[in-house]
Amino acid sequence: MSSLRGHRMHWSAAMLLLAVAALRPAGASAQQDPLYSQYMFNTLAYNPAYAGSADVFTMMALSRHQWVGFAGAPNTQTLVLHSPLPGRTLALGGSVVHDVIGPAKQTSAFLDAAYRIRTGERSRLAFGLKGGVGLYQADLASLSTVQVESANLNISGKLLPNFGFGLYWHSPRHYVGLSAPRLLENTIGSDGSVVVSKEFRHYHLIGGYVIDVNRDLRFKPSFMVRAVQGAPLSVDLNANFLLRDKVWFGAMYRLSSGMGFMAQYRFNDQLRAGYAFDLTTTRIGAYNAGTHEVMISYDLNFNTGRTISPRFF
């Protein structure tokens, strides 16, 4: 009986942790932007300078279900579109992200624009701007672990306009990017006696390159660093292989918090589908069955005289 009671206490504590993550006090901060394991194929969600980087019209959808089996766990759905404009100096894109964690949810829609300049025969540096709005809702009073007046914890339909910037340099085999997708630190909600919550500015640094191991196998190491004031640095390290320009497979390590693997299949020049599985190495890992992330992407090439090469990133 005591072990059951202890399990319930741990469960309640974890749910309270979700509540705190959903409505963060202004005096503290933590990672708020959605995590992506397949970040190297979903770059536009956090870096507007990525728009049009493959010189095709790209449509990508991704669904991430974190901590499966844990009630109220985060889940994220993302839809991304982007393409270069005629002349290929300018590119436009857009993204819609629906993010749910515990009793809080936010749906955001952003437009992206990138200006691209050549830095070599096959390399470009892009400067990007992102602008849009998020709709935030939360009902922390629905959690039995929070014993306060419900009126203090309800946020219904809070609009959060924001904008961001990004830099992205790439060649056929290398890339590096820096971005801050939301520069405004919007106040989400406040109550003099309970909580004052806000958004926090996040910075993303990414990089990677591709090495030919032999004629059938390529190796691509990559990384992502996420930084926000007052929170531990989040670092993803990835090692992926591409077999015969068809199948991606590899592993991921998230510094001090998780590990996993991913795979992707290239059906043809246009269609790709990918899957990633993460395991949490922190204490909350004992209460969930891992994280699943599924991605599908389709490229349209309006330049019929050009063949689409394999997408490395």
Please place each PLM-identified region on the residue numbering:
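Bacterial N-terminal signal peptides that target proteins for export
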Residues: 1-15
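Short hydrophobic "helix-edge" motifs at membrane interfaces and signal-peptide entry regions
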Residues: 14-17, 171-173
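Subset of outer-membrane beta-barrel
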Residues: 31-313
